[in-house]
């Protein structure tokens, strides 16, 4: 078995939330991954983790200004919404030059099949959607730069090839089963030979995870976000992936409201790491419930909440002393369980890998790193990583 290679970065407090721009703090536990199996990343996603390049992070919804919930769609039971159909019809008419042929079937998956097969059978010189490795090219970067400048209003000097590569091309994921297409990819959308959009995807054992989408802003009127999401759901269906992961959902963030329109969707319950229909959460939020909600039992009757929390007002503790335990990061293992797993951990020093019993006799001060990582990654991943102490 090839071990994951992780570097400890610990509990982090950011000075500004990237979602609400309120100036209040946001908190997460983070790791750097040199290597991470697709199977273990699947396990981590189902514990509330996400990746940005090689950086892995698990947000703390209890103590952050915005509560981030992992959201996934059951692709096998997808029910297409009116606005999604409208976007697809408009796109098909533009690409094909004529309206989408009506269907008798009301089944959503049949609708996706009809629409995407219609335009993707026109020939590559007209229209194509292809999958390729997530490598850097100048062509991709130019579309990305144009998108960031016009859609996200970033300055040109802030958008670099290095930053693009780090964010959307570099990936720690590896696949031991060479017969199955897992890993990180770019889904390329071309119209009349021109690159118009790129979907950054992680293909995992149980689902397609959408990392990012960027497109030519000249095509903004075609709602390519909706088109790409439906195309990625179709990819999941065609390749046998049960779930479609759309990253995080924040109910108070207007830009994320669209994710709730893809049905049936589920949110990861932060306290129990169980998937619960999104409607169970939104019905409470829409009636004034706090932004952090966790259902405490299988019947969803024991509801735990946290008051709207401003970590900038917490002066009782130095931020350097924060840990995932004293900050009550939801959904982690207890200290006792995490400590019991240390005997099964490994450490990497130089080119050699050692069991922790040898390493801790020389470096006892790093034991708490193993304990924190074990608590955050869960029992299965805790048994399959080596902690890089020096390279």
Swiss-Prot record:
Catalytic reactions on record: an N-terminal L-alpha-aminoacyl-[protein] + L-arginyl-tRNA(Arg) = an N-terminal L-arginyl-L-aminoacyl-[protein] + tRNA(Arg) + H(+)
EC numbers for this chain: 2.3.2.8
UniProt record, GO biological process: proteasomal protein catabolic process; ubiquitin-dependent protein catabolic process via the N-end rule pathway
Superkingdom assignment: Eukaryota
Localization per record: Cytoplasm; Nucleus
GO cellular component: cytoplasm; cytosol; nucleus
Keywords carried by this UniProt record: Acyltransferase, Cytoplasm, Nucleus, Transferase, Ubl conjugation pathway
Gene Ontology terms for molecular function: arginyl-tRNA--protein transferase activity
Keyword field contains Nucleus: yes
Chief location category: cytoplasm
UniProt family annotation: Belongs to the R-transferase family.
Main function: Involved in the post-translational conjugation of arginine to the N-terminal aspartate or glutamate of a protein. This arginylation is required for degradation of the protein via the ubiquitin pathway. Does not arginylate cysteine residues.
Protein name as catalogued: Arginyl-tRNA--protein transferase 1
Biological classification of the source: Eukaryota, Fungi, Dikarya, Ascomycota, Taphrinomycotina
